[in-house]
Curated annotation (Swiss-Prot):
Protein encoded by which gene: Letm1
Record-listed Ca(2+) 1 binding positions: 700, 702, 704, 711
Protein name stated in the entry: Mitochondrial proton/calcium exchanger protein
Organism: Drosophila melanogaster (Fruit fly)
Binding site for Ca(2+) 2: 783, 785, 787, 794
GO annotation terms (biological process): cellular response to hypoxia; mitochondrial calcium ion transmembrane transport; mitochondrion organization; neurotransmitter secretion; potassium ion transmembrane transport; proton transmembrane transport
Region (Disordered): 877-1004
Letm1 RBD domain residues: 280-554
Keywords: Antiport, Calcium, Calcium transport, Coiled coil, Ion transport, Membrane, Metal-binding, Mitochondrion, Mitochondrion inner membrane, Repeat, Transit peptide, Transmembrane, Transmembrane helix, Transport
Gly residues bias locations: 935-945
InterPro entries: EF-hand-dom_pair, EF_Hand_1_Ca_BS, EF_hand_dom, LETM1-like_RBD, LETM1/MDM38-like
Recorded GO MF terms: calcium ion binding; calcium:sodium antiporter activity; potassium:proton antiporter activity; ribosome binding; transmembrane transporter activity
Residue stretches making up the EF-hand domain: 687-722, 770-805
Length: 1013
């Protein structure tokens, strides 16, 4: 997290300190408008010892807790700016639009859903209040029947009213009836007609702008936005053109580079090495990928319809408010005032209106229109950041001096009012800015109108909207439809034509300025006749005047110096293992990841809101192509880095020995950059080099002479976007804004200021020591700890924020920009933390629901198991009861010994049978031997008696065998088994003796013979 930076020199007189790292020090920009100057005051002596890099935020916040929050501009600064680290985040905070079109759509859908819920809750609350009033009236008049009837009637009326209001609210959400078929067909034909017109206009504009790029000309900020707008329209109108345009650009890039060398970044080198050409080609492809990624952010969502009802309502409101006789309600003013975007309003205002805004904010009113827009844009960003900080802390926490500074910074009356009045108007500003989301541009414009301070705020806004140009209404109407996915091609044509007109005006203004400079150079005042003795005496005075005039006119940093610094940085990039290209690819990957998150959030919100909005097909195709292109560029970069490593290893014999000691962080010294600039350009203006040096020093947070390549590149891009001429005063403000970003990460790519300056000198091959010193002084302002090392991200951030337009910022403006970027960095970090917390809470709730569901399933399973066990127990109890009632006959059986020989038992039984067969007299019922008779005698004389005796003998033998079998069964069967016994194999019959076998055979023969008889 960011820590505060301590500045050297005169800024040490400042005593402005923060009580909290996250909150207090963010409001420092409120005192930026004070006109007090303390440049003649000496430096402060009682500096606190510098802390180490590992100083924690908690310790720093505790040490800052007892100081005051705000001081006038005479005391503006930080005592702790020398320690802490700076990390200038390379995210969308530098851009004019903070997010993609999809993110804007998501925010709008959320706001609409929130407004609907608030309306329903308000109507329900009104219905409940009416019911309460009716019930109280019924209670008061309950003594009489007439009063009771009246109360019942009132209650029914209130219930009917609440039901009607809810029905109306429900009817609002019901889809409107479809138009007739003929009307719909005509609307579609008109839509496609304007779509074809827009297609041809886009092709013509893209061709012109691309031709300027191929010829080596730099596009201004407005031209760059126009190119992105027209390219996104081409992809939207013809989605499959992504498969044609993007591969066509990739394949023809080598051809373009060959026939149009002006599109290559100029490094003032004549080397024809293949590696150098490959690196330059990689830089161009990276620029193309960056442009396509920015175009992807500009592509809106897609809707089934083409006409927006809200856009039509806004058009009717804008037409009605411009007519003084038409009445406009306050609700309509607040509702549609939030639709005027700051960027749209600033781009559409005339020079007179811009100058009036600058006077209100006490800014410079001299300069081009582009310069006025730039400093107003910078100031509005600062005010928006301060509004969020003050709202978080509360207006009541500010003292009188802080209230005066905050009101003065917002163009409100600050002196001659009571403290309560100051708090009231500041609360009103913050409420309109944050809660009602009224743009600060309209609030500031309302201060420029000749309206009494006692007037109502809505009346001020009404008069302000009334004087806005027509272009503001067209842009806002298109933005409303675009956020809903309902793009009107006719309105888009009007906007593009208006932008083309403004581009021509800016080119004409730039051309006139160039002609004026050339005419001023050609005009020469005739020198008067001077004697030799006077000439020799005044030579020293003339040299001194020339030196002072050069230093006064060229104190600021111009776009030429920015290009010089950028070229020196790219030259150092090849020696620093292509850190610039690596950082660019890293940024592109982060941007694509953010875009993917926006798309996922759109899907979630769409399911809740039930709106038929989705990501367009062209955006999907373009996302896939850009993602594939970045992957290819990453592989090319790795290949190029490996080749450079091999070349260095082959050229240097001690490379292998020294490579292990190289720091993982790529360091670039300020002196190296200055030397590079000297090699690049041989000039006689040493002051110009001093400007770049000052810029690099300001980027050096820890003042070690080493800065990150990423920070330098971002600063170059920020200034180059506006193509600005920055004077010394604005440069100080700009650098102050960047130097306040105290948390610089040591794992970033950093660059030594000395190395950067050496490369600048070599590339320019210049002897302009004064200019080099000025550049070096600027670089030193980025060096917080004065160690000669700054981060490239600091420089890139500054230069990207300034942009492409031809303006010139002072040192003060650069310091203010550094401060602004620091505030945006902290607020963005807090927003990311809040978003991460919300996401983690959502995931925790989802996980909790899953755990609860699993617990419910587990508890259900346990209950089922308990029920099953209970049923089993009941069945067992029933079986036990049945066993007790039925007699157990198995217990009567004798238990067979477990290891008793069954064969022996069978043998004993066989012996019993043998004895029974041999001794029939043992049976008392058996017949005697005398009555039997012999065979022949029986056959002749006693036939019937002998036959009956044979039958009796057979029945006796059968009964004996049955009894023996029953006894054997009782011995074999178990006596304790209740259920069905298992299948028991029949044991093999043991071998019997020959005597038993013969007896059995004789017995069977006798029985058979008797049966036959």
């Amino acid at each position: 997290m960011n820590a505060l930076l301590r500045h050297k020199g005169r800024n040490l007189r400042t005593s402005h300190l923060a009580q909290n790292v996250y909150k207090r020090f963010l409001k420092s920009n409120c005192c930026a408008c004070s006109s007090v100057n303390v440049t003649d005051e000496p430096a402060k002596e009682d500096e606190l010892p510098r802390r180490s890099a590992s100083t924690s935020v908690l310790e720093l916040s505790r040490s800052l807790g007892t100081y005051r929050r705000f001081q006038p501009h005479a005391n503006y600064g930080y005592d702790y700016s020398g320690y802490g680290f700076r990390h200038l985040h390379t995210s969308r905070t530098l851009l004019e639009t903070s997010s993609s079109k999809i993110d804007a759509t998501v925010k709008k859908l959320k706001n609409q859903q929130k407004e609907k819920v608030e309306e329903i809750m308000k109507e329900v609350a009104n219905g409940q209040a009416a019911a309460v009033r009716a019930s109280s009236a019924a209670t008061a008049t309950a003594s009489s029947e007439k009063g009771q009837n009246a109360s019942a009637t009132a209650g029914s009326t209130s219930a009917t009213a609440s039901t009607t209001s809810l029905a109306k609210t429900a009817d609002k959400s019901v889809a409107k009836p479809k138009k007739p078929l003929r009307t719909r067909i005509w609307d579609e034909l008109v839509h496609y007609y304007h779509g074809f017109r827009l297609l041809f206009i886009d092709v013509a504009i893209c061709s012109k702008l691309l031709w300027r790029v191929l010829n080596g000309k730099t596009l201004t900020r407005r031209e760059n936005k126009q190119l992105q707008r027209t390219t996104s329209d081409l992809f939207r109108l013809i989605p499959f053109s992504v498969f044609i345009i993007v591969p066509f650009m990739e394949l023809l890039l080598p051809l373009f580079i060959k026939f149009f060398p002006g599109m290559l970044p100029s490094t003032f080198q004549t080397s024809t090495d293949r590696q150098e050409k490959l690196r330059q080609s990689l830089s161009v492809r990276l620029e193309v990928a960056k442009f396509l990624q920015q175009t992807l952010d500009q592509m809106p969502v897609q809707h089934k319809e083409h006409s927006s009802e809200e856009a039509k309502q806004f058009e009717a409101f804008f037409t009605k408010i411009r007519n003084p006789t038409e009445p406009v309600s306050n609700d309509e003013i607040i509702k549609f005032a939030k639709r005027f975007d700051d960027e749209i309003t600033l781009d559409s205002l005339s020079r007179e209106q811009l100058a009036a805004l600058c006077r209100v904010l006490e800014l410079n009113t001299i300069g081009t229109t582009t310069l006025l827009r730039f400093q107003l844009r910078l100031k509005l960003r600062s005010l928006a950041t301060d509004d969020r900080v003050i709202a978080r802390e509360g207006v009541d926490s500010l003292d009188l001096l802080e209230l005066q500074q905050a009101c003065k910074a917002r163009g409100m009356r600050a002196y001659g009012l009571t403290e309560e009045r100051l708090r009231f108007q500041l609360k009103e500003w913050i409420d309109l800015s944050l809660n009602e989301q009224v743009p600060p541009t309209l609030l500031l414009l309302s201060r420029t109108m000749l309206i009494s301070d006692d007037s109502i705020t809505t009346d001020k806004l009404k008069e302000t909207i009334r004087v806005l140009p027509d272009a503001v209404g067209a842009h806002t109407r298109h933005a409303i439809g675009e956020s809903e996915g309902k793009v009107d091609n006719k309105t888009k044509i009007e906007i593009i034509k208006e932008e083309e007109r403004k581009i021509r005006e800016e080119r004409e203004e730039e051309r006139e300025e160039t002609i004026a400079k050339r005419s001023a150079i050609k005009e020469e005042i005739p020198a008067p006749y001077v004697f030799a003795e006077k000439l020799s005496g005044s030579q020293d005075l003339l040299d001194h005047k020339e030196q002072s005039s050069v230093s006064e006119t060229d104190k600021g940093i111009s776009s030429t110096d920015v290009q010089l610094l950028s070229e020196a940085l790219k030259t150092l990039s090849s020696d620093k293992q292509l850190v610039v290209e690596k950082e660019t690819i890293k940024e592109l990957k982060e941007e694509l990841a953010d875009y993917k998150e926006d798309v996922e959030e759109l899907r979630e919100v769409r399911q809740v809101v039930k709106e038929p909005v989705r990501e367009s097909r062209a955006a999907k195709l373009l996302y896939n192509r850009v993602n594939k292109m970045i992957s290819q560029l990453d592989n090319v970069l790795n290949d190029l880095e490996a080749r450079q490593h091999q070349i260095k290893q082959a050229e240097s014999s001690d490379y292998a020995a020294s490579s292990p000691t190289v720091e993982p962080q790529q360091m670039v010294h300020i002196d190296e950059l200055v030397a590079t600039i000297r090699r690049m350009k041989e000039a006689s203006d040493e002051e110009r080099f001093k400007v770049v040096g000052d810029l690099l020093v300001k980027l050096d947070a820890d003042k070690d002479g080493v800065i990150s390549v990423n920070e330098i590149t971002k600063a170059v891009q920020s200034i180059d976007r506006e193509a600005t001429n920055i004077d010394k005063k604005q440069l100080e403000e700009f650098t102050e804004l960047l130097s306040k970003l105290a948390s610089r990460r040591r794992h970033e790519e950093i660059v030594h200021i000395d190395d950067l300056m050496n490369n600048i000198k070599v590339l320019k091959e210049t002897s302009d020591e004064a200019r080099l010193k000025h550049i070096e002084a600027v670089l030193e302002k980025f060096d917080a700890d004065k160690d000669g090392v700054v981060t490239v991200n600091d420089i890139r951030k500054v230069l990207e924020s300034i942009g492409r337009d031809n303006i010139k910022l002072s040192d003060k403006a650069i310091e203010e920009l550094i401060s602004l970027l620091d505030k945006e960095q902290v607020l963005q970090a807090e927003q990311k933390i809040e978003k991460a917390i919300a996401k983690s809470m959502k995931e925790a709730e989802k996980l909790k629901s899953e755990v609860d569901k699993a617990d419910k399933d587990l508890s259900k399973l346990v209950n089922d198991i308990h029920d099953s066990a209970k049923e089993i127990q009941d069945i067992a109890n029933e079986m036990r009861d049945k066993e007790e009632t039925v007699p157990d006959k198995a217990k009567e059986l004798k238990a067979e010994p477990a290891f008793k020989d069954t064969a022996k038992t069978l043998k004993d039984n066989a012996k019993d049978l043998d004895d029974l067969a041999k001794d029939p007299k043992s049976d008392p019922k058996s017949p005697t031997k005398a009555s039997t008779g012999s065979g022949p005698a029986g056959l002749s004389g006693g036939g019937p008696s002998s036959g009956s005796s044979g039958i009796a003998t057979g029945s006796t033998t059968e009964s004996a065998l049955r009894e023996a079998a029953e006894r054997q069964m009782e011995k074999i069967l178990p006596s304790t088994d209740i259920g069905l016994p298992p299948t028991i194999q029949t044991p093999s019959q043991p071998p019997t003796s020959k005597k038993a076998t013969a007896t059995a055979s004789t017995l069977s023969t006798t029985i058979t013979a008797k049966k036959l008889l």
